UniProtKB/Swiss-Prot annotation:
Active-site residues, as the UniProt record annotates them: H22 (proton acceptor)
GO molecular function (one): tRNA binding
Origin organism lineage: Bacteria, Pseudomonadati, Pseudomonadota, Gammaproteobacteria, Alteromonadales
Superkingdom: Bacteria
Site (Stabilizes the basic form of H active site to accept a proton): D95
Root EC class: hydrolase
InterPro entries given in the database record: Pept_tRNA_hydro, Pept_tRNA_hydro_CS, Pept_tRNA_hydro_sf
The protein's name: Peptidyl-tRNA hydrolase
Name of the coding gene: pth
Keyword Ion transport part of the UniProt annotation: no
Family: Belongs to the PTH family.
UniProt source species: Shewanella loihica (strain ATCC BAA-1088 / PV-4)
GO CC field: cytoplasm
Protein's GO biological process: protein quality control for misfolded or incompletely synthesized proteins; rescue of stalled ribosome
Length: 195
């Protein structure tokens, strides 16, 4: 059984960024909210959109920070501190350049891999890297100098469909995580082939 109490979807705020690759984490949390039948509402105390939900029989908080990506830790830290949620009870969903569209993987701990949202969360959790991640593949533009424009751009329709399909599978794997355990959820998600 999972001990996850907070699920975070990283994003940049506003309509301008809503459909950009960098917001893949928020797409996952929005889909979880839809499955639970809850609406995320703005909460200035936590600098984000939040909801309390019963997810597969467990009480969890959903959070999409409304800070810019590089300040995500302000939101995550505020909510985690208020509800006394430990880093190993947090799952952060984020876009992942090092995996192609249609691939997603759960992971515990690790560095930030250059992801500014993760970097700020680690800093605001007193440098504790021991939180879970859901890495949602968006692919890489091929050249480091193109990364910023790439993550802030919209995926072509074929890639977008693959990202949406793997997010749907990640939601199904989250059910396995909550009803069984992380290793079974990992096996399910990591063996999934989109398309």
């Amino acid at each position: 059984m999972s001990n996850i109490k907070l699920i975070v979807g990283l994003a940049n705020p506003g309509d301008k960024y809503e459909q950009t690759r960098h917001n893949a984490g928020a797409w996952y949390v929005n889909e979880l909210a839809r499955v639970c039948g809850v609406s995320l509402v703005a909460d200035s105390k936590y600098y984000g959109l939040t909801a309390r939900a019963t997810l597969y029989g467990k009480d969890v908080r959903l959070l999409i920070p409304t800070t810019f990506m590089n300040l995500s830790g302000k939101s995550v830290g505020a909510l985690a501190n208020f509800f006394r949620i430990a880093p190993d009870e947090i799952l952060v969903a984020h876009d992942e350049l090092d995996m192609p569209p249609g691939v997603a993987k759960f992971k515990l701990g690790g560095g930030h891999g250059g992801h500014n949202g993760l970097k700020d969360i680690i800093a605001k959790l007193a440098n504790d890297k021991g939180f879970y991640r859901l890495r949602i593949g968006i692919g890489h533009p091929g050249d480091k100098s193109m990364v910023s424009n790439y993550v802030l751009g919209k995926a072509p329709q074929t890639e977008q469909r693959l990202i949406e399909e793997v997010i749907d599978e990640a939601v199904r794997a989250t059910e396995v995580l909550f009803k069984e355990d992380m290793s079974k959820a990992m096996h399910r998600l990591h063996s999934y082939k989109a398309g």
